[in-house]
Amino acid sequence: LNRPARRHPGLLDVDELRRLAASTRSPDSIDEVLVGLPDLQGRLQGSGASVDHFIEDVLARGLPACAYLLAVDVEMDTDAGYAFAPWDTGFGDFRLVPDLATLRRAPWHPRSAVVFADAWWPAGGMVRVAPRAVLRAQLDRLYTRGLAALAGTELEFLVFTESYQQAADRSYGGLTSASRYNVDYSLIGTSEMDGLVRTIRRAMADAGVRVESARAEVHPGQYEIVFRYDDAMSTCDNHVLYKTTAKNLAAQAGQAVTFMAKYDQGEGNSCHVHLSLRGRDGATLFAAEPLEDGRAAPDEESAERADLAGMSKLMRSFVAGQLACMAEFALLFAPTVNSYKRLAAPGSFAPTGIAWGRDNRTCPVRVVGSGRSLRIEHRVPGGDANPYLAVAGIIAAGLYGIDNDLALPPATAGNAFTAPGVARLPRTLRQAQRLWRSSEIARAAFGDDVVDHLAHAADAELASYETTVTDWERRRAFERL
């Protein structure tokens, strides 16, 4: 995995787990370990093992789980079209092998621990289509080049006063937002959300995830909690833990939260991804080499273009790769039908074109920071994105730019929504899926098995959507047609 050799406060090791398991009379005792595999939707799937069974057996042999976990849709419905696990194989087991670097107390359940796992075939070999494995393959490509990725995600969600059961009883419509109006950046009008949000923040901090900030966003009831950047795998694990924690703590509080990209006609939920590359020794690689007086040393190209000031050649090619691959990789950033409702919203901060800019929020690639903090912000992913696949896509696109020495076109200084000559993102999941399936770049970077597996997942999503009668159809046609 090439994860940095460090351990955050709040994480557990096996010796601590044994001690907590033995102290059965203590309120800090742990009696269960939840072993979770992130699925194609970025949800934790798996089983709870008694702590004794985990220590005595699961650590050595893993935990069996049905292979269909990586071949189902949002509804957990199986589909016959996956080469990975078709019906005629009988849907046998793979084994969930715990990644002990992720072991911690479950933030939503004080007597349980949780650990992330990788899927392995019984005969050996990691299941390549598992999202963690997809990201690991791209991290390995970085590692062979002497590189490592640091990442952070900014994930938004909506808070409602109703419970999940009440929301379901109302068909998830007509719900009461936890704030009555736009309180973006406001310190007024957020008290209705503060109780649940504070509980989530504290629980995540106790689980070893450093909280940097939290604030309300544009949509009524919308909030964003920002955690400190980390190595790319840890950030994606923390992202999934955050979503899982938020949903469980909301349910315990009798409330509901949603991370769906576009709940209604208001602002959608984004998941902006910040990413930079470092050397394996921690050296800064995105910033140009400084002169003795601290100014960045320009090369011939950056000396002629002010928009490139401070960016290393490696960073420029990395950003150019984002632009070159963005349309073909859109499926990794926007994996559902609903994703494209967010990206199609006029007048929102969700990008529609393929461009980059300096601190320009109308561009899908926003270059921010300076020196060691110089990084890209990828603004296409929504709250429904699988973080492992999104970050893997950003890395693969960047490596395509670096390996092919791509030149970076001029930055967009104005409104990228209306700028002439700006290519557009796919407008629908169908368009994105076709571009992904036919992408030679994707097949070279990820392998045919991964490309075909994710393309079929989009097929299943589209088949469900295209055969579902919606409220929109009934409202328009029931009486008037």
Predicted regions and their residues:
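Catalytic-core signal marking the mid-to-C-terminal active-site face
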Residues: N2-H8, D15-L20, L241, N248-L249, ...
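ATP/Mg2+-dependent ligation/transfer catalytic cores
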Residues: N2-S213, T235, R424-L481
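Short glycine/proline-enriched loop/turn "hinge" motifs that connect secondary-structure elements
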Residues: R104-R111, A149-L150, A214-H219, G266, ...
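Short, hydrophobic beta-strand segments
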Residues: V115-W121, Y223-Y229, L275, H378
